[in-house]
Design a protein with these regions (language model features):
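Post-transcriptional modification and biogenesis factors for structured RNAs
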Residues: 2-4, 373, 409, 428
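N-terminal Rossmann-like or analogous alpha/beta NTP/dinucleotide-binding catalytic cores
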Residues: 2-127, 224-237, 286
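Glycine- and acidic
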Residues: 10-16, 44-48, 210-215, 269-274, ...
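Active-site cores that bind ATP or allylic diphosphates and position pyrophosphate for catalysis
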Residues: 109-264, 273, 298
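Catalytic adenosine-cofactor/nucleotide-binding cores of aminoacyl-tRNA synthetases and other
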Residues: 235-398, 406, 462-496
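Long, amphipathic alpha-helical coiled-coil segments characteristic
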Residues: 403-434, 439
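Helix-rich, typically C-terminal accessory recognition domains appended to large enzymatic cores
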Residues: 431-477, 481
Length: 496
């Protein structure tokens, strides 16, 4: 970061080769929190130079995932800005120009080695138990000779010419100084044979031209950090502040979490992909809270944060480079807490799509009545239709074994249904104040346990052994429908 640069400028630069996962979401979040705390600019840059792995729908899914987390940006493909274009596929000529500059100043070279030669070279190195590296065959070909070969149609790539003597030291904010021997740094390809620049060149050029002050990214880039340092040094450019985040471990704490293992998590109702977590009923506030604490902490006590509180509390000094195990139990806890913190109208709107996905026509007005009596009972938005779908069913279909209560037979339970119908049909209205006192009197009259009488009534009205508060539920369902359901249960019990 230049001494003269005052503004904090960060970038989140995903490759549209797949869905946005927890690692990408956390990287974007930390960049966003830093900018909001420091008053800088957040840049979204799409690194789409790998055309073979490009997935057409991935970019929009990444954008949707960021928006779901509550993250927005100041500059990007959809917003423009002073340093665009913000898609690397539209910057090919820029990278080519800078690659040629490196060649002209002796910091890069054209390589004409065939795939077959490189494969044989690698095989022999493995046989000799050497560290795989380019052997430098084309490293000292004169530039004019190389350009004549290119003009004649010979295929080539461009490699960075790393120094082979001495050491390179780079400072990472979390890990301190990282020093490597230059002889261990390969002559990496920076431009492929199809003319597309690789990340090592493209990202460094873009970070410089877009005036990026802090690079917050995954720890998988640490091995090539010395290369990136050398590329910037070759151009004479200032370095950003480097911040390489901690690795995510599997829930067991053993081994690095990978995208390939997400299929196994889905079986247990979990995922490392943000769109899956949304579909599984997690609220964005909980996911944001959760991933923020996997690599950062405010103190050893405070766990619950909304986005505003995260911005106020965030600091780079509290980032932790130690690997973080993915703890889905903690996510479930956060989800329940944040659901209970939502306003009723907000929660009603959020659960509506889950009712519709389960086949219910759930109007918002009714949902606003239901939400207060289920808010404390759901740990995920997807649970709402499972415990409250009966509000929107024309008929419920209770199981006979659920209607028959412990210690009673079908005839006794039919009698409970008959008497319940008589009591409730005589009331002007059924609600939490009208119905429950009368039903408790019935419990005394029949000399039964409350669970037996209310158990018959609950299953008859809701079709479920467990439900939201019974009389509040009956008020929302409406007296006519309640009585019809009790009558149907009575018939079922008498026929048993």
């Amino acid at each position: 970061m230049s001494e003269n640069q005052k503004e904090v400028r960060v970038r989140f630069a995903p490759s549209p080769t797949g869905r946005l996962h927890l690692g990408g979401g956390r990287t974007a979040l930390y960049n966003y929190l830093l900018v909001k705390k420091m008053g800088g600019k957040f840049i979204l840059r799409i690194e789409d130079t790998d055309q073979k792995r490009y997935v057409e729908t991935a970019e929009q899914e990444i954008i949707d995932g960021l928006h779901w987390l509550g993250i927005d940006w100041d500059e990007g493909p959809d917003k423009g800005g002073p340093y665009g274009p913000y898609r690397q596929s539209q910057r090919k000529e820029i990278y080519q120009r800078y690659a040629e500059q490196l060649i002209d100043q002796g910091d890069a070279f054209y390589c004409f080695c065939s795939t077959d030669r490189l494969s044989e070279m690698k095989r022999l190195q493995q046989q000799r138990k050497e560290f795989p590296h380019y052997d430098g065959l084309c490293r000292d070909i004169p530039v004019e000779e190389a350009r004549k070969r290119i003009a004649a149609g010979e295929s080539y790539v461009i490699r960075f010419k790393t120094p082979k003597e001495g050491t390179t030291t780079v400072r990472d904010l979390l890990r301190g100084e990282i020093t490597v021997e230059n002889k261990t740094i390969d002559d990496y390809i920076i431009v492929k044979s199809d003319g597309w620049a690789l990340y090592h060149l493209a990202a460094m050029v873009d970070d410089h031209l877009m005036k990026i002050s802090h690079v917050i990214r995954g720890s998988e880039w640490i091995p090539t950090l010395p290369l990136h340092h050398l590329i910037l040094k070759a151009f004479g450019w200032d370095e950003p502040v480097w911040i390489h985040l901690s690795v995510f471990l599997k829930p067991s704490g053993k081994g690095k979490m990978s995208k390939r293992e997400s299929a196994d998590l889905i079986k247990d109702g979990y995922s490392i992909f943000l769109t899956d977590l949304k579909d599984l009923g997690y609220v964005d506030e909980a996911v944001t809270n959760w991933i923020a604490l996997m690599g950062w902490s405010y103190d050893d006590r405070t766990e619950i944060f909304n986005m505003s509180q995260l911005i106020d509390a965030f600091s780079l000094e509290h980032l932790n480079p130690s690997p973080a195990a993915i703890n889905f139990t903690k996510l479930d806890y956060f989800n329940g807490v944040h659901i209970r913190m939502l306003e009723i109208d907000d929660l009603a709107q959020r659960i509506q799509p889950y009712f519709e996905a389960d086949g219910y026509t759930a109007d918002l007005d009714t949902l606003k009545k239901i939400t207060p009596i289920i808010q404390e009972r759901i740990a995920g938005l997807d649970e709402a239709p499972k415990i409250a779908g009966f509000f929107f069913e024309k008929e419920v279909h209770p199981k006979l074994e659920d209607l028959v209560q412990k210690g009673l037979d079908a005839a006794q339970c039919a009698d409970i249904a008959t008497k319940s119908y008589q009591i409730l049909s005589a009331l002007p209205v059924i609600d939490k104040d009208h119905g429950e006192p009368e039903m408790r009197a019935l419990v005394e009259e029949l000399a039964l346990k409350p669970a037996q009488v209310f158990g018959v009534l609950r299953v008859a009205v809701t079709g479920q052994k467990i439900s939201p508060p019974l009389f509040e539920s009956m008020e929302i369902i409406g007296q006519d429908v309640v009585l019809e359901r009790i009558k149907n249960a009575e018939k079922m019990l008498k026929a048993a």
